Structure formats: C-alpha cells, structure tokens
Amino acid sequence: MEIPENIQHQLNQFQQLQQQAQAVTMQIQNVEVQIQESETALEELNKTDENAEVFKQAGNLLIKVDYAQAVEDMNEKLETLKLRKQTMARQEERVMKKLEEMQTNIQAAMQGLQGE
C-alpha cells in the first residue's frame, strides 16, 4: 500500500515536531541543572560570612565581588532560570498537545486508507 502524499507530508511534519519536542525537553533538563547549581551556590553563599571574600567567574577569570552583590546576582539568575523553565514547560506542553493531535489525525487517515 502506497501512502498518499498528503499523509506522507503529515508524517514528515510529525517527525519534525517530535524532534522539536526532544530539543525542548533537553533544554528544560539543561535549565534544571543550572537551577540546581545556582541553588547550591546560593546556599553556600548564605552559609558564608558577609565579610568573606567572594569571587565570581567571568570566562576564565575569577573576579572579586561584593558579598551583597553576589547574593543579589545569584537570586536574579535563579529567578531568570525559573522563568525560562516555566516558559519552556509551556512550550513543551503545546508541542506535546500538537503531537497528540497530529498522531490522531494520521491514525484516522491511515485507517481510512485501510477501509478503502
């Protein structure tokens, strides 16, 4: 049985959407790791005396920063990462919903072919 061109096109779109879903999932996992690292760094920073020397990594350099500024920077970074994760989670949800819809449509089209 040969698959009609329109169904083949839907299958190609479905595969592209699957790849997009995988990419979004990987990005979410990456952000989750960054969130964990930032939370750990912030916890360690909060355990540190406010008068202690604090350094921030900038590329290959460590730069001395003010303790309060370091805490503020880490909190901002953490907030940004959490917002990014929420945005990506919504994107993942939309992609997964679209995948389910496409799968249903493709299955219905294939069953229609078998009924012919």
Curated annotation (Swiss-Prot):
One of its GO terms (biological process) is protein folding. Gene3D superfamilies: 1.10.287.370. Pfam families: Prefoldin_2 (PF01920). CDD domains: Prefoldin_beta_GimC. Keywords: Chaperone, Cytoplasm. Disulfide bonds: none annotated. Transmembrane segments: none annotated. The keyword Transmembrane helix does not apply. GO terms for molecular function: protein-folding chaperone binding; unfolded protein binding. SUPFAM superfamilies: Prefoldin. Its main location: cytoplasm. One of its GO terms (cellular component) is prefoldin complex. The keyword Cytoplasm applies. It comes from the Archaea. Heterohexamer of two alpha and four beta subunits. Belongs to the prefoldin subunit beta family. Molecular chaperone capable of stabilizing a range of proteins. Seems to fulfill an ATP-independent, HSP70-like function in archaeal de novo protein folding. NCBIfam families: gimC_beta. PANTHER family: PREFOLDIN SUBUNIT 6. This is Prefoldin subunit beta.
